[in-house]
């Protein structure tokens, strides 16, 4: 049996007798900590480079993200902006004689308020509580301003104020400073849809029946449309009858939204719209068949808005061709505002248009886009062939702009895109 002393000596020899043992252990430990220290330094150096980039990217994305909240706030800010020229509650709008936003002059009109309220009322049920508060505030201010544009004797409305005299916004040397235009069906139906007043709605619809093409053949349009008994754009007795398919879409939207009984004039107006589509005049001659909007894409937008209320069989039959036309134009257009209008149109038809990658950086350019949504078209009253000649040369035409309305269109696109995404997610969940 080995003695304890001998055992201890063996252990000592193993531990202390080997001169390289501690040296090797020390080297391994030292190298391990060196590697960890170097690794930590490398990681920290890389994080120092990467973290600011990540932070910048996240911050930039957050800043640039285009949201419904951002656009509603921008619209309300424009409505609340105080100015000696603009009526309280009116969205600032402008006129240009050169189809250039930068050459604009200020204009007071209820038209864009009515368009914005129409859109907000359509979309408000999709808004959050906070968004609805802003939406309701915009609508309330617009309704207070609306009274300044109402006819004193009947439930009709004017593009410009009726409560006081004002300088005619177009060429005063040509038309005179006190010249004004009669009330029109477009502002009337859009204004009445702001109010939701059943009595005024029915009274206005009854009044409209007297303002149709009752003395054919009409000299302000092509012969093929000259015997149609559709609505004129104007209420004025001294004004010639002027057809505009976009205005007629708004009138029929008014009829459909209020569940009014269709009249002979309503049916004749629908038939005129159908004919302009079948003859492809909405594509070949948009300024002639829609003189106050004058753009194929904007005509398509009006058609889609009407058809989104409830199916109109005569238009549903033509829908495939309309969709194809909208798709063709959204691909060929280089104008971002026009692309937005066409994308909204396709979404209203439950189609899948190309996604528009937009940020807050694009908003200013969209607000000041040179595409006019509405045109003050003096030659529209002229008889043929003078009408077509003057419009072909773009003489006596005035282009109307409203940055807040462009924001509203952008907001409408976001709402519809969001709704489309939710439907897709719901369908995918159901499939699973």
Residue ranges: model-predicted function:
Residues 205-221:
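Long, hydrophobic, well-ordered secondary-structure blocks that form the structural core
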Residues 60-66, 426-432:
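Sec-dependent signal peptide cleavage junction
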């Amino acid at each position: 049996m080995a003695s304890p002393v001998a055992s201890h000596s063996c252990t000592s020899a193993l531990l202390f007798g080997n001169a390289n043992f501690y040296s090797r252990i020390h080297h391994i430990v030292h190298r391990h900590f060196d590697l960890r220290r170097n690794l930590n330094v490398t990681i920290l150096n890389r994080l120092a480079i990467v973290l600011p980039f990540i932070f910048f990217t996240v911050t930039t994305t957050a800043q640039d993200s285009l949201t419904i909240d951002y656009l509603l706030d921008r619209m309300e800010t424009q409505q609340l902006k105080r100015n000696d020229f603009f009526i309280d509650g009116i969205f600032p709008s402008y006129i240009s004689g050169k189809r250039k936003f930068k050459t604009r002059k200020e204009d007071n009109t209820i038209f864009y308020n009515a368009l914005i309220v129409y859109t907000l009322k359509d979309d408000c049920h999709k808004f959050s509580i906070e968004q609805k508060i802003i939406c309701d505030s915009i609508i309330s201010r617009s309704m207070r301003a609306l009274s300044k544009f109402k006819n004193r004797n009947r439930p009709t409305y004017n593009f410009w104020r009726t409560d006081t005299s004002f300088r005619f916004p177009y060429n005063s040397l040509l038309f005179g400073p006190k010249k004004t235009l009669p009330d029109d069906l477009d502002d009337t139906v859009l204004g009445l849809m702001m109010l939701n007043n059943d009595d005024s709605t029915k009274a206005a619809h009854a009044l409209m029946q007297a303002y149709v093409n009752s003395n054919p053949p009409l000299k302000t349009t092509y012969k093929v449309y000259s015997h149609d008994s559709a609505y004129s754009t104007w209420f004025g007795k001294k004004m010639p009858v002027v057809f505009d398919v976009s205005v007629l879409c708004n009138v029929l939207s008014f009829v459909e939204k209020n569940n009014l009984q269709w009249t002979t004039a309503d049916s004749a107006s629908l038939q005129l719209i159908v004919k302009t589509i079948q003859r492809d005049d909405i594509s070949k001659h948009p300024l002639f068949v829609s003189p106050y909007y004058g753009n194929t894409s904007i005509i398509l937008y009006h058609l889609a808005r009407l058809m989104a209320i409830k199916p109109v069989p005569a238009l549903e039959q033509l829908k495939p061709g309309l969709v194809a036309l909208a798709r063709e134009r959204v691909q060929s257009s280089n104008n971002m505002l026009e692309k937005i209008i066409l994308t909204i149109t396709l979404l209203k038809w439950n189609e899948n248009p190309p996604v528009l990658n937009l940020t807050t950086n694009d908003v200013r350019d969209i607000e000041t886009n040179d595409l006019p949504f509405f045109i003050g078209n003096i030659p529209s009253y002229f008889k043929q062939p003078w009408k077509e000649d003057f419009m072909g040369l773009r003489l006596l035409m005035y282009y109307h702009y409203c940055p807040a309305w462009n924001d509203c269109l952008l907001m409408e696109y976001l709402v519809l895109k969001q709704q489309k995404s939710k439907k897709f997610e719901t369908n995918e969940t159901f499939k699973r």
